[in-house]
Structures are given as C-alpha cells and as structure tokens.
Curated annotation (Swiss-Prot):
Subunit structure: Component of SCF(virF) E3 ubiquitin ligase complexes. Interacts with host VIP1 and SKP1A. Interacts with Arabidopsis thaliana ENAP1/VFP3 and VFP5 in the host cell nucleus.
All residue ranges annotated as the F-box domain in the record: 20-42
Biological function: In the host plant, component of SCF(virF) E3 ubiquitin ligase complexes, which mediate the ubiquitination and subsequent proteasomal degradation of target proteins such as the host VIP1, after its implication in T-DNA translocation to the host nucleus. Required for the formation of tumors of a wild-type size on certain plant species only.
Segments for region (Disordered): 1-21
Protein name from the UniProt record: Virulence protein F
Amino acid composition bias (Polar residues), ranges on this chain: 1-15
Compartment(s): Host nucleus
Superkingdom to which the source organism belongs: Bacteria
Keyword terms: Crown gall tumor, Host nucleus, Plasmid, Ubl conjugation pathway, Virulence
Listed GO CC annotations: host cell nucleus
Principal localisation: host cell
Length: 202
C-alpha cells in the first residue's frame, strides 16, 4: 500500500471518509488483524503501510502498538538498520587496496545482495524512532540480536582496509541471507499470531 493507494482513483480524499469511519468502528482485535495484513513480503512496503495506518487515527495507532505489530516493528527496525549499514560497507569494497580487481559485475552482485534481496535498508528510512538495543524473547529474537555483531565484524575490516576486496562477497552473502530469513520469519510469526482480545470500551 503506497501513499497514493490511500486515495481514490480521482485523487480525492473525500471518498475515503465513509470508509475510514467504518474502519474505526471495527473492534480492536479486528483492527489489529487489518494492521497485520499491511506487513507484506516487501519490507519497504510494510514500513510505509504500518506508518500510514498508525497515523490515521488514535485507534489505528493503538492497533499498531499491540503485541504482534509492535514486536514486528521492533524487529524490522533492527533488521533494516543493519541492512543499511551492511549496504554502506559493501559500497566501500571498491576502495579497498585490491578493489580495482573487482569487475563491475562483481560490484553489482554485492550491491544486489544487500540492497535488493532484502530491501530492508530502504525500509529503515520509513520508520520513526531508533531501534531497541536488544530484543528479549524467543529464538528468532536471539538471532536478530546477533545480526548487528555479524554486520560489525565484516564492516570494520572493510572500513580499515583489513580485508581483501575479493573476500568481501563470501563474508557478506551469509549475513544478507540471515537478515532476509529473519525478516521472513518475523513476518510469518506476525501472521500466525493469535488475535488479541478486544478491550475498547472496557
């Protein structure tokens, strides 16, 4: 759901008012279910959708702050921030002492690995606030907590010219894969989360 999709085909917001009113009349647990469906397999889209939904009204903001959505957003912030850092590190690969040995195709593959496969680096720019330092929870949270260390361990040698440009790809690929897998697992967990009990009006 892009920003433009919040408007009708004529570009007018007026046609949306009745629909918005009907949406806000839904019970809390149904609003949360609606919000969950805004998390697509495209993390940039997910970040935009959830942010726009949250800004619509107090009820939609509360729906986004319920346990399944809030946890997903926290995970997305950490993953997207580190995908962005990994992407920055890869862009410096060509500046390494042996960087001239990298072909344009190899450089393109590196950039694609961190910027296209998980497009999370872009998603980071669509979120409010800083990511939590650490998540506390299940096995997936522990995996996500470890990703910043993995990114740092490859980014630092690149920044200080302590790694061969030809070795960067082998170091980056599993980290990029871990980030993408963690995002996919986080979304799957979100979609399978039980509905919260409605508390509005209590």
């Amino acid at each position: 759901m892009r920003n433009s999709s919040l408007r009708d085909a004529s570009g007018s917001n007026d046609a949306q008012v009745p629909h918005k009113t009907e949406l806000l009349n839904l019970p809390d647990h149904v609003l949360t279910e609606v919000a969950k469906r805004l998390a697509t397999n495209n993390p940039v889209e997910s970040a935009e959708n959830i942010a726009n939904f949250s800004k619509s009204h107090r009820f939609t903001r509360d729906a986004v702050r319920t346990e399944p959505l809030e946890k997903f957003s926290s995970r997305l912030k950490i993953l997207s921030r580190n995908a962005k850092l990994l992407s920055h590190a890869v862009r410096h690969a060509a500046t390494l002492p042996d960087g001239e040995q990298l072909s344009e195709a190899q450089l393109s593959q590196m950039r694609s690995e961190v910027a296209t496969r998980p497009v999370l680096g872009v998603a980071y720019t669509h979120q409010d606030g800083q990511p939590e330092e650490r998540l506390s929870g299940n096995h997936l949270d522990h995996k996500i907590n470890n990703i910043p260390n993995l990114v740092f361990n490859v980014a630092e040698p690149i920044m200080f010219n302590e790694i061969s440009a030809l070795e960067v790809m082998a170091e980056v690929r599993p980290i990029a894969r871990s980030i993408k897998t963690a995002h996919d697992d986080a979304r799957a967990e979100l979609m399978s989360a039980d509905r919260p009990r409605s508390t509005r009006g209590l």
